[in-house]
Amino acid sequence: MSYNRTLHSTTSILKMNSALQISCLLLVLGCLLGSGHGQSDAEFAAKSREISQIFGNPSVDKYTKVRNLPALVAFYEKYSSRLRLTAQEKKGIDNAIRQYRAQQNQKVDGVSAQGGTLFDILKKVVEVIIKVVV
């Protein structure tokens, strides 16, 4: 009889330990996810300011803006769900980015295309994103 009681007690303790471990794991995950969301809010705000300073400032030269187009595209792709865009604006931006990527992928003698109309393709995108971010 004492063997059954000991076995029962050990089983209860194992179940309790498992429940405690799962609770701790859920608590840690909750904290990580919560702080991750807070970090992404801060990161979104910082990236928005950075994009606005580059593309929303008329004193920044065209070369600097063209050089930062990949950052603008990455910003849009990462945070597009946070930007308040109409369906038409979103469709236009997606099409412009598709054109931009197609032009970036074109090779001339094994080298990516340089300059050209890259900025012109995304000029409207820049205007819409800056309007939404600011």
UniProtKB/Swiss-Prot annotation:
GO terms for cellular component: extracellular space. It is found in: Secreted. Residues 1-38 form the signal peptide. The keyword Secreted applies. It holds the Pfam family Turandot. Keywords: Immunity, Innate immunity, Secreted, Signal. GO terms for biological process: cellular response to heat; innate immune response; response to bacterium; response to heat. InterPro entries: Turandot (IPR010825). A humoral factor that may play a role in stress tolerance. Belongs to the Turandot family. This is Protein Turandot E. It comes from Drosophila yakuba (Fruit fly). The lineage of its organism: Eukaryota, Metazoa, Ecdysozoa, Arthropoda, Hexapoda.
